[in-house]
Amino acid sequence: MNIQALLSDKVSQALIAAGAPADCEAQVRQSAKAQFGDYQANGVMAVAKKLGMQPRQLAERVVELLDLTGIASKIEIAGPGFINIFLDRQWVAEKVEYALTAPKLGVAPVEPQTIVVDYSAPNVAKQMHVGHLRSTIIGDAAVRTLAFLGHNVIRANHVGDWGTQFGMLIAYLEKMQNENASDMGLSDLELFYQQAKKTYDEDEEFALRARAYVVKLQSGDEYCRQMWRKLVDITMAQNQVAYDRLNVTLTKDDVMGESLYNAMLPEIVADLKAKGLAVESEGATVVYLDEYKNKDGEPMGVIIQKKDGGYLYTTTDIACAKYRYETLGADRILYYIDSRQHQHLMQAWAIVRKAGYVPESVPLEHHMFGMMLGKDGKPFKTRSGGTVKLSDLLDEAVERAGKLIAEKNPDMPADELKQVINAVGIGAVKYADLSKSRTTDYIFDWDNMLALDGNTAPYMQYAYTRVVSVFRRAGVDENSLTLPLVITEDREAALATRLLQFEEIITTVAREGTPHVMCSYLYDLAGLFSSFYEHCQILNAESEEIRQSRLKLAMLTAKTLKQGLDTLGIQTVERM
C-alpha cells in the first residue's frame, strides 16, 4: 500500500481539473508534524505561479475537486496554499488488516526489471579489509531490497583477478609448491602477496620468470591458467567465509571478474576506432571527450590501449557495461564503488553511450559512498597504522558483543547465546554503516554502534524482541486474532499510519540506493511502538476487541521490523 502514490494521483487529478497542466506535480509528502495531518500536498504554489493565480485560491479550488471519500477524514488548507490531509482511521485500520495477511506486508508487485548490481569487488591473493565493507554491505542491502520488490537481480562481484601482478603471484605459488609450502603460505593471503612482492623486488631471476608468466597467462598458456585459477579459487573460498559471517548473499556463482571481459577488449578498441571515437596518439589509443577538459581547456584524452598493447581499467569497464546490457539483458545497472572512482566511471560510461553499447533508456548509476574513518577523522587503521583486516574487525565485534550479551543473560543456553552474540556483533558493524548516508564519510565508533539505545542494531534487535515477547506472554498467535481492528487512540493511529508507509520507504530505498532511509524508518517505527506500548494497555485492555486490535498492531510491527532489518541483512533474535 503506497499511500503517498495514491494521494499524489488523487491530488494531481484535482489540480488538472482545476486548470493545471497535465504534467503538474502534486508534491505529496509525509507530514513532519501531526498538526499538519498525515500527508501534505505542496505542489499548489508552483502550479499557481504558472497559472498566474493566488496559491490560496487555487488550493481552495483543488480541495473542492479532491475526492478522498473514505480515505481522508479531514482536508485543510494551511499557510499560502499547503493542503493537509488527515487519514480516516477506519480506512487506516482496514489497510493494516490487509497488510497483516497479504504477501510482502501488502507491498504491491512491481513490473520486474533485470537489474545488475556491481558490489564488493575484492582483489585476488589479498585478504578483504575494512575498505571492502561498505561496498559489500550497502550493495547487498540494495540487492535484498530489489529482490523483495520482485526484480530479477543479478549480483556481479567484479573481482580483481587479472593484471601484470599475476605473473609474480604464479611464480611465487610455483616456488612454494616446489618447497611443499603451498597451504601454509596461502592461509594468509596478505602475507603471501607481500612475500611474492619482496621476492620479485630482490630476485632478478624470479622477476624474469614472473614477467614471462604474464605473457604466457595472457596468451592462454594452460599451466599458467591452472595456477591462476588456483589463486582465484583459494581467494574466493576465503572471501566466502567473510560473506557468510556478514550474512551477505554473494556466492562463487556471482563472481564476474575482470578476466571475464578479456576477449572483448581487442574488439572494443577496433570498434571504437572504426566509429571514429578512438584515435592513435603517441603510440597509444585514445578517446577524446569534449565533456571533460584538461588544464589547458582542451578535450581530455582517455587511454583505452597503451602503446605496449596493454589495456586499462577504463577499457575493461567499457566492456563490462556492454556485456551487462547485451549479454545479461540489464534494464538498469548499479555500481556500488567508492566516490574516488566517480570520474573514471563517468568517462567510461561517456564512451559507452557514444559507442551505442548501452542505450540511454538503460540507467548506469554510480551509487558512490564515502570512507570509514577512525575517531581521529582519518582513514580507519590499526594502531600501528596498517590496514584493518575484515576478519579481525568482525572477530572484535563478536567479542565485544559477547561481553555485552553474556552479562545480561547469564542463564541463556550456550547455543542460543552464541547465535545472539553473533547476530548482535555483526549486526552492529553493518547497521552502523548502513544507518549513515552512503554519500558521506562516517566515524567508526565501537561504543556508539554497540549501544542499546539510539539508532543502532542492538537497539533495533532489542525492540524486535520486545514486540515478540508480547505474544509469548499473551499466548496467542496470528490465527487467533479474529476480531476487527479498531483505532481509537492517537498513538494507535500514529503507529498504524507509520506501518502503512513501509512500501513508500522501500520504494525510495530501491530507487535511490539509500539504506539509511530504511534504518531511519525502522528506528522511528520502534519509537512509535514504544510510546504505544507504554500508553495503551495491550494484554489488559478494557475489552477483548481492543486487546485483539492492539495485538494486531503489535503483530504487524514485529513483521515490519523483521522484514525491514532483513532487507538490510541484519538478523533478528527472539530474546536478548
Swiss-Prot record:
InterPro entries: aa-tRNA-synth_I_CS, Arg-tRNA-ligase, Arg-tRNA-synth_N, Arg-tRNA-synth_N_sf, ArgRS_core, DALR_anticod-bd, Rossmann-like_a/b/a_fold, tRNAsynth_Ia_anticodon-bd. Keywords: Aminoacyl-tRNA synthetase, ATP-binding, Cytoplasm, Ligase, Nucleotide-binding, Protein biosynthesis. Disulfide bonds: none annotated. Coiled coil: none annotated. One of its GO terms (biological process) is arginyl-tRNA aminoacylation. One of its GO terms (cellular component) is cytoplasm. A motif ('HIGH' region) lies at residues 122-132. It comes from the Bacteria. Monomer. This is Arginine--tRNA ligase. The lineage of its organism: Bacteria, Pseudomonadati, Pseudomonadota, Gammaproteobacteria, Enterobacterales. The gene is argS.
